[in-house]
Amino acid sequence: MADSEQQEDYKIQGFDADTQSLLKTALKEPGSVDLEKAASVIVDQSLRDATFSREAGRMCYTIIQAESKQTGRTVFRSTLLNRLQVEYKNRKETRARSLQEWVCYVGFMCNVFDYLRVNNMPMLALVNPVYDCLFDLVQPDNLKREEEVDCLVLQLHRVGEQLEKMNCQRMDELFSQLRDSFLLQGGLSSLTQLLLLEMIEYRAAGWRMTDAAQKYYYSEVSE
């Protein structure tokens, strides 16, 4: 537990002292701080900082669990989900304005989906929004941007298997589109083609990568 707290402390070092205090208290005594503000701070930072967005889901999960246990309320979770919904509705404008913010948003959404559970199951309310973001990433124009391809691959490695269990049909549709792009779309970089092929084979192998495949793709990407 001490290691976990140190990791969380480490993730919030970029905040000012007051915000660090707010988040540290929210993690341990959520009933004594403004959880709506804490949720907004975490989302805002996640949209700016890719490293933070990849880890913030764990912090959200910790606060949600602590609030439920100590107060029986869901203020933080409700605020977080409402904010994610707003950002989801504005995602096309976000992408047009800032590619980095858009990629951070997708990473954060998938991270929250990965960590948040209801009765030991992923949150149903997040399944289709996460899928919609992944479908956005496999659009022809998006596949020409390395940042979006990297994001797509990272998120499918993170939550692809869980998503497929929640809605197999949409995953079939996503990979049908991904295969078509790999086979038919011109103008893709050799790295993008390699990453798309890796994802196709990764899913075909039951969301597992063989040692041989890992060595092959790793050596190709690093060259």
From Swiss-Prot:
Any single GO molecular-function term of the entry would be:
RNA binding
Recite the UniProt keywords alphabetically: Cytoplasm, Nucleus, Translation regulation
Which SUPFAM superfamilies would you find in this protein's record?
ARM repeat
Per the UniProt entry, the signal peptide is none
Q: Which cellular component terms (GO) are annotated to the entry?
A: cytoplasm; nucleus
Task: List this protein's GO terms for biological process.
Answer: regulation of translation
A Pfam family annotated for this chain is MIF4G
Q: Which residues cross the membrane?
A: none
Q: What range(s) does the MIF4G domain occupy?
A: 9-206
Subcellular location(s) of the protein: Cytoplasm; Nucleus
* Subunit architecture: Interacts with eif4g1, eif4g2 and slbp; probably tethered by SLBP to the 3'-end of mRNAs ending with the histone stem-loop, it also interacts with eif4g1 which is bound to their 5'-end.
Q: Please give the function described in this protein's UniProt entry.
A: Functions in replication-dependent translation of histone mRNAs which differ from other eukaryotic mRNAs in that they do not end with a poly-A tail but a stem-loop. May participate in circularizing those mRNAs specifically enhancing their translation.
Report the sequence similarity comment from the record.
Belongs to the MIF4GD family.
The protein here is known as MIF4G domain-containing protein
State the species of origin: Xenopus tropicalis
